[in-house]
Design a protein with these regions (language model features):
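Conserved acetyl-CoA-binding loop-helix of GNAT-fold acetyltransferases
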Residues: 43, 49-64, 87, 190-202
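Conserved GNAT acetyl-CoA-binding A-motif
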Residues: 57, 64-77, 205-216
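Amide-forming acyltransferase catalytic core, primarily the GNAT-like/NAT-type
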Residues: 91-192, 199-200, 250-261, 265
Length: 332
């Protein structure tokens, strides 16, 4: 907790609404961009329906933009809240795929040796290296992994690695639940390393079922039964795992233009909640220029006519091969 990372609404002596904004980094288009993650959004029950949370979010958007954040992300506490946050410009951008396997035989022996004695600095570096194939992902530093390890251990699980000569070949964050083993996050430097750590985990925990979360677009989950005898895929489901909101469209589109210098687009963007985002953007030869809507008129021919949610879908879902991935946010 830090006071400068909280926004609150106080009425008299009552705390009416609050949110906590935490700094993270998002890998995007080959670079890294600042992202604020929101947690603990809440309104005192007797004060709901009075617009306090909406006013609080709008204030926080402006504050975080001034602090240099381009994006704000959150994980709705329940599905019904996706529509609510959508009213404030959030769009579902993060997806994962959940796999359920049944273990119906004896798994083959593996040479993989599980280890949980490493320090978090080494772990965060190895995790970032192993997830570099994910073109858009939320990154975690040493402090994050300190918290993750403490949290999963309190739940009876742990963070496990396999390695060769001091270099991690796989990392898995797991929590046992009944006769199931939940793998909250897993990454490896190849299919066989993935198979090795899963086999070793199953030998350690002896589950009857395996629940595995992977980035949407990863093919490993589908082919895992063909690589590891003794397990059978029972279900596979794509799930929304988070929303994001653009708070600095001008800088973000500049980053996009720099990453794709051969692309040319003209975009009309309207953002009623954050008018500073509105404008006509011209992306050409690695640069992005902006014209205010008031000066460009409504007759300007554009390739795209977006509100902020449509721009988010275009940038994060249509222009990225693998859906953006956000994991280990302590939301499960």
């Amino acid at each position: 907790f830090s006071p400068d990372r909280c926004c609150v609404v106080v009425r008299g002596e009552r705390l009416c609404a609050a949110l906590q904004h935490l700094p993270y980094t998002l890998s995007l288009w080959g670079g890294e961009e600042p992202m604020s993650y929101w947690a603990g959004l809440s309104t005192y029950p007797e004060e709901r329906g009075r617009g306090f949370m909406g006013a609080l979010m709008t204030h926080a958007f402006t504050l975080l933009c001034r602090r240099g954040f381009l994006l704000v992300s959150l994980i709705p506490a329940e599905k019904s809240l996706y529509d609510y946050y959508g009213r404030f410009g959030f769009e579902t951008a993060f997806y994962c795929r959940k796999y359920l396997y049944e273990i119906n035989g004896v798994l083959p022996a593996s040479d993989a040796v599980l280890d949980n004695t490493f320090d978090s600095e080494w772990l965060s570096g190895e995790w970032c290296r192993l997830t570099m194939a994910y073109s858009c992902r939320v990154l975690h530093d040493t402090d994050d992994f300190d918290v993750v390890r403490t949290d999963v251990r309190l739940a009876g699980g742990d963070v496990w690695t396999t390695s060769v000569a001091g270099t991690a070949t796989a990392v898995a964050v797991v929590v046992p639940r009944g006769d199931s083993l939940i793998i909250l996050d897993i990454c490896a430097d190849g299919e066989m390393a993935m198979v090795g750590i899963i086999s070793a985990l199953c030998r350690r925990y002896s589950p009857r079922r395996l629940l595995l979360s992977l980035p949407d677009g990863s093919e490993v989950g589908e082919i895992l039964p063909s690589l590891l005898s003794g397990i059978a895929l029972k279900s596979s489901e794509r799930e929304a795992s988070g929303m994001t909101r653009i708070v600095d469209a001008e800088t973000l589109l500049g980053r996009y233009a720099d990453a794709y210098p051969n692309r040319t687009h003209t975009i009309r963007l309207r953002d009623d909640l954050l008018p500073s985002n509105s404008g006509i953007y011209t992306i050409k030869e690695g640069r992005s220029g902006k014209q205010p809507l008031s000066l460009s008129g409504t007759d300007t021919v554009c390739d795209y006519d977006f509100d902020v949610r449509a721009l988010t879908r275009w940038l994060f879902l249509e222009k990225i091969d693998m859906a953006p991935y956000m994991s280990l946010m302590l939301s499960e």
